[in-house]
Amino acid sequence: MKYVLVTGGVVSGLGKGVTASSIGVVLKACGLRVTTIKIDPYLNTDAGTMSPFEHGEVFVLDDGGEVDLDLGNYERFLDIKLTRDNNITTGKIYQSVINKERRGDYLGKTIQVVPHITDEIQDWIERVAMNPVDGKEGPPDVCVIELGGTIGDIESMPFIEALGQFSYRVGPGNFCLVHVSLVPVLNVVGEQKTKPTQHSVRGLRGLGLAPDILACRSTEPLEENVKAKLSQFCHVPDQRAHEAILKVLDLQFVGKVPREPKLVEWTERASKFDKLKATVKIVMVGKYTGLSDSYLSVLKALLHASVAMGRKLVVEWVPSCDLEDSAAKETPEAHKKAWKLLKGAEGILVPGGFGDRGVQGKILAAKYARENNVPYLGICLGMQIAVIDFARSIMKLPGANSTEFDPDTMSPCVIFMPEVNPEMVPEFEKAGLSFVGKDESGRRMEIIELPSHKFFIGVQFHPEFKSRPGKPSPLFLGLIAAASGQLETLLQPSSNIVNPNPMPRFPIPKKTIYHAKKPLDSLVNGYFANGNVIHT
């Protein structure tokens, strides 16, 4: 097993996750099987309870693991399926060690950071790195490890020590360190400065790790003299990253590894993206709109679909609170701006969320889309609020609500389990709302559709987690197609649009009964074309 460690210096937010994912893509394009591990030094055992404002989106894996958003990047870039064990946190490591101590596994020894915590980290990495993630038998060839945070952080120290030991454990030729750093440009002189990177590398070396490669971020491409200076003072080669990595890992002469990575698919996709001119405007209505990373997978799914449909994506962010009637009095300018953006939408998307703040604004967004025939996609809570709006507006149940927001509502159209109240489903369907996807018991409503509408879909699950650059989610593909006037073309049997991704993602049940009702079904049908789904 070969290991590539990606660390970061100078400042946080430099793009270690994208760097790690890109390295994985290049190695995969060289013919190697790649897996990934993300290390998060925080004490939480996982990201499930963290606010999106704290850490961005919580990405959900096939096994239900709630993890850092970088694992979503890995899955999208490499088209792999990871598990919760691919995300290591300080909380998980300490919890594992304490559990072993309570069982007596350490035979009465004093438990210390070194060696017990550091050994646990190394053992965890070695164990998880051997698990195949690409659907094939046998262990991967290379494991790319990303260490979260910045070199010098106190909370990262046990991991730095463990990884230093780990480089000796696996031996020369099996460990490559890529350090991501910042090369700032001072406006006063307009010169690219290398000192921050030099100091970061010196600090890394002082902790027992020496970088083999530098990945430098700057506002402009690095000048040749800057590259030469960094190469000289930090003792790293200049350019040709894949060759440098293969050389450090003793892989450059392995028979199955081509000298040049095959990146034609990626370069063609990038070229297509750069040439896009016609736009499609999607309005995102949510409560965490102040931080785009809160909806990262949704944004990526929209981007994948937009490129596939030949459109340049324009996303307008609307805080759901600003749409509410109370905002007209409290923040009139924000209220006016929010409604102006909503009314200029070519498509409306209401993503998942929880809590009652801003819910009324989301209901109003769904109502506007329904009444004005604007393409609409509601995900999780976005589906539930569409049901609430339908109950209030069409079925004349003004008090209709979710028991999450009003436990005493007289018309509980959404309940804790199974969500949409199954007792009210016949009334909904009689009024014109179709429940086209259900679980095998027929009680859990998974997909709603408004047959009289151009495109009005709500889903209880999260299709954004399965979208890939070359295989966009069909539900997002449908939204973009409807918003750009291409839905009929997309639904033609002869359509050469990229094939929809057929795999649903947690938390959709193991079996979903899909009831075909209208032409749009051919799009949604493709989403459920796998062994876990029953077609009727």
Which positions does each model-derived feature cover?
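Flexible phosphate-sensing "switch/lid" loops adjacent to ATP/NTP-binding sites
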Residues: 1-347, 353-355, 361-368, 375-377, ...
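Short Asp/Glu-rich motifs
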Residues: 45-47, 223, 327, 388, ...
